[in-house]
Regions:
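Core catalytic DNA strand-manipulation module of type IA topoisomerases
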Residues: 12-13, 34, 39, 62-66
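Extended, well-ordered alpha-helical scaffold/bundle regions in very large, multi-domain proteins
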Residues: 20, 33-44, 48
């Protein structure tokens, strides 16, 4: 707020409905997603939603995503420290477990190829992808400069088994 007026950052935050809404908004405000491709944006945003079942070293698609993830972790760390100082916890820790899968699926790879060497079930994959699509829609509405890339990522992710099982998962 600026007095009684909601700031641009506040308006943008009001369009994000996720557990890590503040970390997502700060990621957007800091321009972390601005120079990424559509699928790189999806890969990075997946860390705010996914929860790995077992600890594995995650695969990171490329250096652009890796650099963005470092920036996001720095943002999350600042928020986490601030929350710790005030005895609150609203931001879940980023989880890189879906980055590679989102990147490969969005890149047009088949389901068997994407899930190879993963312990994720098809249902969990569809659910995670649908959640990512929902977040991409929110980000598209929150920052107009990211709208085109987010909508492009959605088209690339919302296909095949995701469409077929989307209403069931």
């Amino acid at each position: 707020l600026d007095g009684d007026t909601v700031t641009a950052s506040g308006k943008m935050l009001s369009k994000i409905y996720a557990e890590s809404d503040l970390a997502i908004a700060e990621t957007i405000n800091n321009g972390v997603l601005d120079k990424l491709s559509d699928i790189e944006i999806a890969s990075v945003l997946s860390i705010f939603l996914f929860e790995s079942r077992k600890p594995e070293a995650p695969k990171i698609p490329n250096t652009q995503v890796q650099d963005a993830l470092k920036d996001v972790v720095a943002i999350w760390s600042k928020l986490h420290n601030l929350e710790s100082e005030h005895d609150v916890k609203t931001q879940k820790e980023p989880d890189f477990g879906f980055c590679w899968l989102a990147f490969r699926w969005g890149g047009g790879h088949g389901l068997n190829s994407v899930l190879k060497n993963s312990d994720l079930t098809v249902g969990d994959f569809v659910r995670s992808t649908k959640q990512l699509i929902d977040l991409l829609n929110q980000v598209a509405g929150a920052k107009s400069e990211l709208r085109e890339k987010c909508m492009s990522a959605i088209k690339k992710l919302d296909r095949g088994v995701v469409v077929y099982l989307g209403g069931v998962a």
